[in-house]
Amino acid sequence: MIGYISDNILLPILDFFYGLVPSYGLAIVALTVVIRLALFPLSAGSIRSARRMRIAQPAMKKRQDEIKSRYAKDPQKQQEELGKVMKEFGNPLSGCLPLLVQMPILFALFATLRGSPFADVPYLVNLKVLPSDQIAAIEPKPFTSSKHSIFISETKHFPVIASLPSGTKLGVGDKAQIKLQTLTGESFTSRLSGVEGGTKFTPTWSVTKGDDLVKVSADGTVQALAEGDATVQGKIPGLAAQSGFLFIKALGQVGFYVDGEINWDIAILVGGFGLTLLVSQILSGRGLPANPQQSTANKITPVMITGMFLFFPLPAGVLLYMVIANIFQAGQTFLLSREALPENLQKILNDQLSKPALATEAIGGSDRLPFEPKKRSK
């Protein structure tokens, strides 16, 4: 499903925006905004549900505990009363369905930005080398990899797979060629003939595991040297992997610290992701009673995730998408936090905020945002 969404929905949208303004950086921004706008109703439902459940949860839990205690010996009546409470306050899991529906689209968007044209596309083939006297008894099972759409120009792309007709099991001393080809069986290199600058898409081959067990030549031919498990990788360069955007040196660049040097563009993107995530989480609790555990999680989570992405190998184009998506999410959360609540929930919230301890500790209980300076008292 993810591949279908990427090839038939996201890539055509990407082609459209690149046709309007020939900048892959702007195309990423536009694609992110369009997808987020399309998913707005679903994500808004999740945000509303989370906000309402956070308000209702204390009163809801109190009612549920009372019912369980009162009707402990009458399970049927207990379930009936619990159902009434659920109907009054809403199902805590109701916000999960919109989130689950949009996940395939978000995963497809993520996968699209990790592939061609924004990054080099790897094809991994796991091989098993057996003794030469055993391989004869094994029936060959042809291998084909997952397909990836490869851009060979700004608007021309097609799916490419890796194929090994003799299968992934080789005998010591055997040779086999891994072929990169289209779904119709046409060689990838033959599709490059006649393409201006086509040589820059020539695949490179390497052994990523077990380099003492197999070796691979420039045309993808593998020779088995010794028994064991090995992995061979073929990599097709991304068309826009070296294209820059604003302060980003290359959209396909990976890594915060590479070859002894800090990539400051990656550092800025990761820092921007952490900051926008923090703002979004602060806004999600605006005007609600303080929850010490939630407040601590809101502060720690962005720091942990940001630290992880400093060393997680994500291309700059993917990080750009994540920052733009977080900005959109923060704006959406701010707007929804100003929506009127149902009468019963508003009454519960007013009661919660009327308590001195909660009122003084409420997160964003006033109109002032958490990051705005306090007004001076007269």
Curated annotation (Swiss-Prot):
Membrane-traversing stretches: 20-42, 93-113, 264-284, 304-324
Keywords assigned by UniProt, alphabetized: Cell inner membrane, Cell membrane, Chaperone, Membrane, Protein transport, Transmembrane, Transmembrane helix, Transport
Entries under InterPro entries matching the protein: YidC/ALB3/OXA1/COX18, YidC/Oxa/ALB_C, YidC_ALB_C
Membrane topology (UniProt): Multi-pass membrane protein
GO cellular component, one term: plasma membrane
CDD domains linked: 5TM_YidC_Alb3 (cd20070)
GO MF annotations in UniProt: membrane insertase activity
GO biological process, one term: protein insertion into membrane
Main location, first listed in the record: membrane
Location(s), subcellular: Cell inner membrane
Annotated family: Belongs to the OXA1/ALB3/YidC family. Type 1 subfamily.
Subunit structure: Interacts with the Sec translocase complex via SecD. Specifically interacts with transmembrane segments of nascent integral membrane proteins during membrane integration.
Function: Required for the insertion and/or proper folding and/or complex formation of integral membrane proteins into the membrane. Involved in integration of membrane proteins that insert both dependently and independently of the Sec translocase complex, as well as at least some lipoproteins. Aids folding of multispanning membrane proteins.
Entry-linked PANTHER family: CYTOCHROME C OXIDASE ASSEMBLY PROTEIN COX18, MITOCHONDRIAL (PTHR12428:SF65), OXA1 (PTHR12428)
Name listed for the protein in its UniProt record: Membrane protein insertase YidC
Organism: Prochlorococcus marinus (strain MIT 9313)
